Amino acid sequence: MGIDVKELIRRNRQKHAEFEKKINYKFIDLRLLQKALIHSSYAFEQAQAGKNNERLEFVGDAVLDLVVGNALYRRFPEMREGELTRLRAALVNEGHLATMARKINLGYFLCLGKGEDNSKGREKSSILSCAYEAVIGAIFQDGGYDAVAALVERFFLPVIDRRKEDLLLADAKSRLQEILQEKHNEGPSYRLDNEEGPSHKKRFTISVLFRDEVLGTGEAGSKKEAEQRGAALAIKKIESM
C-alpha cells in the first residue's frame, strides 16, 4: 500500500489536462497539482496519512491573503484599511472559496477516501475550500507570485467589481462583533425599530446598539439584511472616530 504520485499522474493525465484548461494554468511540475488534489481521507486509506494536500493548503492560505490583499490595495485606492480587510475576508472565507471551487468543478478532480466519497465529500464546502487553497499553494510553488496573481485577476476581481457592496455587507455583522470584542470584550445588540408593509413586501428598520448608544441603523426587506446594513454603518462610524 502507499501513494505512488507518478502512477496517479499517469492515471489522471486526462483529468489534469482538463483541470489545467479550467484554471488556464499549465503546471511545470505535475506532482504539485496531484498533491494538491489528494485529500487526507485518501492518504489515510493508503496508510500514508502525511501525504495529503494540507501542507500546500497552508501555503495557499497565506499566499491568497497576500495576493488578494495586494489586488484590492491597487484596485481600490479610496478604501480604508478596515474596508479592505473586510472585503478580503469576504473573498477568502470558506463559503466563497467553496463557491469558486464549484465553478471549476474542483470536487470532480479530488482523490478522496471511499468513506468520504460515499458521504458526498466532493460537495462539502470545507473540503472544497481547503482543496482550492491547496491548488493555490501548488500554483505558487510551481509558478510563483505572478502565476497566482494572474489567477486572482481572472477569477476573483470580476466578482469584486460586481458584488463589492454585497461582499462587504455579508461580512459586516461578524466584523463588527470582532471589533467590539477586541476593543471592549463585549458585542453589539440589535433592536427592531420598525416593521411595515404586507407580508410579501415587508420592510424592516433595525438599529445596532452598543452600551445603549446607536451606532448605525439599517433598513431592508429582511431582518438579516437590515442588521448587516446597520452593522456596516456602525463599522464606518467606529473607523471615523
From Swiss-Prot:
Residues 16-144 form the RNase III domain. One of its GO terms (biological process) is rRNA processing. Its EC number is 3.1.26.3. Its cofactor is Mg(2+). It holds the Pfam family dsrm. Residues 171-240 form the DRBM domain. NCBIfam families: RNaseIII. This is Ribonuclease 3. It comes from Desulfotalea psychrophila (strain LSv54 / DSM 12343). The lineage of its organism: Bacteria, Pseudomonadati, Thermodesulfobacteriota, Desulfobulbia, Desulfobulbales.
